[in-house]
Amino acid sequence: MTNIRKTHPLLKIMNSSFIDLPAPSNISSWWNFGSLLGACLAIQIITGLFLAMHYTADTTTAFSSVTHICRDVNQGWIIRYLHANGASMFFLCLFLHVGRGMYYGSFTLYETWNIGIILLFTVMATAFMGYVLPWGQMSFWGATVITNLLSAIPYIGTDLVEWIWGGFSVDKATLTRFFAFHFILPFIISALVMVHLLFLHETGSNNPLGTSSESDKIPFHPYYTIKDLLGLMFLLLTLTILVLFSPDLLGDPDNYMPANPLSTPPHIKPEWYFLFAYAILRSIPNKLGGVLALVMSILILAIIPILQITKQRSMMFRPLSQIMFWILTADLFTLTWIGGQPVEYPFVTIGQVASILYFSLILVIMPAVSLIENKMLKW
């Protein structure tokens, strides 16, 4: 008799995706982040659902409803902090996942890579709208500053901003629609994740060597289910330590003050995972130029497969490219640091240099280094 998991219409989809899936035998722990991102998404949806049961999307009660969740709801504080810090873990895994894709040449799986970029944009939009919901000082001013960037779009900019706000400033209408979108987007993300996996399973996973895995594959279960569980344990341990010992470590103290449209915080800055893009935005004196640079800082990922001129897919045996990759990583750390600093000398100059280096590395230096490596290997 054939096993039910191979014949049942629903179970056979699960089986071919997570049990009998042929996987390369040599993929390292860097391939764990896909499953960890799935776990993060599940944590965010579950905790978010419980928070939505007690939250009110109204400017007069939003802040106090979050306080009520933390003080009066059973285990409300832990749900709130799991959700807030879960977002940080989500982005940490996302950045490592994208970095692994760049290092090992996974961007040659074009459909998977491009849907991944769409997912990154969607997750960033969701996180931004979620940050507005507690209606603290940084929530309000962050929403005002970031949505106002759209006014840089020629001709339609001002109308577009007022349309998004639902009025002439960030107010009740803005908060209500942000809550609606913040609630629905994770489910859209879940659907996109399925499409991401669909395209990945069409081609099969890449591996650290960047070579074809067709000759040597093993079933996903039990080998990689166990490996993913180990990664999940580390993720949950880190998240638990963060939530129980230092829940506000990655947050902004200004967000414990209710939103006040008449008082601007001394330094408006987003959460840590947006700081690199915020630094790039601030490094360009022109408003429209800054907005374009901000969008391009993420959209540039879509250009990477076009700039791929190396004969070797992975960077594993390309030491010069490895050096450039780690310089890019250090540059992103620098941009993240600069994004959290005040707009004054020398931070502005450092930010401008780091921004130029970021785009130069991806668009010019790394392809040039790949060309040199090809010549060195006489290819």
Curated annotation (Swiss-Prot):
One of its GO terms (cellular component) is respiratory chain complex III. The keyword Mitochondrion applies. Heme b b566 binds at H97, H196. The chain crosses the membrane at residues 33-53, 77-98, 113-133, 178-198, 226-246, 288-308, 320-340, 347-367. The keyword Heme applies. Binds 2 heme b groups non-covalently. Keywords: Electron transport, Heme, Iron, Membrane, Metal-binding, Mitochondrion, Mitochondrion inner membrane, Respiratory chain, Transmembrane, Transmembrane helix, Transport, Ubiquinone. It is found in: Mitochondrion inner membrane. InterPro entries: Cyt_b/b6_C, Cyt_b/b6_C_sf, Cyt_b/b6_N, Cytb/b6-like_sf, Cytochrome_b, Cytochrome_b_C_euk/bac, Cytochrome_b_N_euk/bac, Di-haem_cyt_TM. Its cofactor is heme b. The cytochrome bc1 complex contains 11 subunits: 3 respiratory subunits (MT-CYB, CYC1 and UQCRFS1), 2 core proteins (UQCRC1 and UQCRC2) and 6 low-molecular weight proteins (UQCRH/QCR6, UQCRB/QCR7, UQCRQ/QCR8, UQCR10/QCR9, UQCR11/QCR10 and a cleavage product of UQCRFS1). This cytochrome bc1 complex then forms a dimer. Component of the ubiquinol-cytochrome c reductase complex (complex III or cytochrome b-c1 complex) that is part of the mitochondrial respiratory chain. The b-c1 complex mediates electron transfer from ubiquinol to cytochrome c. Contributes to the generation of a proton gradient across the mitochondrial membrane that is then used for ATP synthesis. Heme 1 (or BL or b562) is low-potential and absorbs at about 562 nm, and heme 2 (or BH or b566) is high-potential and absorbs at about 566 nm. Belongs to the cytochrome b family. This is Cytochrome b. It comes from Microcebus ravelobensis (Golden-brown mouse lemur). The lineage of its organism: Eukaryota, Metazoa, Chordata, Craniata, Vertebrata. The gene is MT-CYB.
